[in-house]
Each structure stands twice: as C-alpha cells, then as structure tokens.
Amino acid sequence: MRPPADPGARRRATHGRGLSAEGLALLVLMLKGYRPLARRFAAAGGEIDLIVRRGRTIAFVEVKARATLDAAATAIDARKRARVSRAARAWLARHPLAADTTLRADAVFVAPRRWPRHLPNAFEIEGL
C-alpha cells in the first residue's frame, strides 16, 4: 500500500516551477535590454512577478508557465489582471519618480522546450 501523498508537495513543486519560469523570463528580458527593478513584489491584494525597466519604460510583468505557450497565454484572467493592477499602483505609490515614465503591463509565457514569449502591453493596468 502506498503512503498518503504529501498534501504540500504539489504546491511546493508548482512554486518551484514558477520560480524557475520567472528566472527564465528575467533572463530573456535582460537579453532584450531590460533592467530588473523588483522581483515578486507583493502588496495588499496583489503581486507582480517582475518589474523591469528599459529606457523610459517600466513594465510590470506577469509570468505564466504552462504545458504550452497557448495555455499560458489564456491563464491571465480578469482577477489576475486586477491583482497586478493593485500591486502596480502600490509600487508606484512607493516610487513616485517612476510616474514620469511610460508604464505598461507585459506578460511572458513559458512552456517546456520552447523559447519564452514576451508580450508587451499584454493588458491594461487598471486605475492608471
């Protein structure tokens, strides 16, 4: 008889895959000339995976890892967009000089054995 599965094992594995995907996404963005400002920024009611800057543009980046790039692309729903928007507003409140830059919400989609897909302006930041 098999012992009962560790209930937290799946959560830990998913978390680990997410961290790996974020690291890969950051590498891809840095190769494109972006400079990291923050990683896994959390504020009340929201979280942003990556905050990067290139020139006068700051991008709040949501990273999604799925079995296929298409599945990753459909994983950013209205609730996730709202959470990223809340966190972006909180980050801007802490960094007022950033308001003088171009702000956008990007996405990076990650799938096994595929080059990550960066989608600039993937969605609107609510309330900006």
Curated annotation (Swiss-Prot):
InterPro entries: Restrct_endonuc-II-like, tRNA_endonuc-like_dom_sf, UPF0102_YraN-like. Pfam families: UPF0102. GO terms for molecular function: nucleic acid binding. Gene3D superfamilies: 3.40.1350.10. It comes from the Bacteria. HAMAP family: UPF0102 (MF_00048). Belongs to the UPF0102 family. This is UPF0102 protein Mchl_0439. It comes from Methylorubrum extorquens (strain CM4 / NCIMB 13688) (Methylobacterium extorquens). The lineage of its organism: Bacteria, Pseudomonadati, Pseudomonadota, Alphaproteobacteria, Hyphomicrobiales.
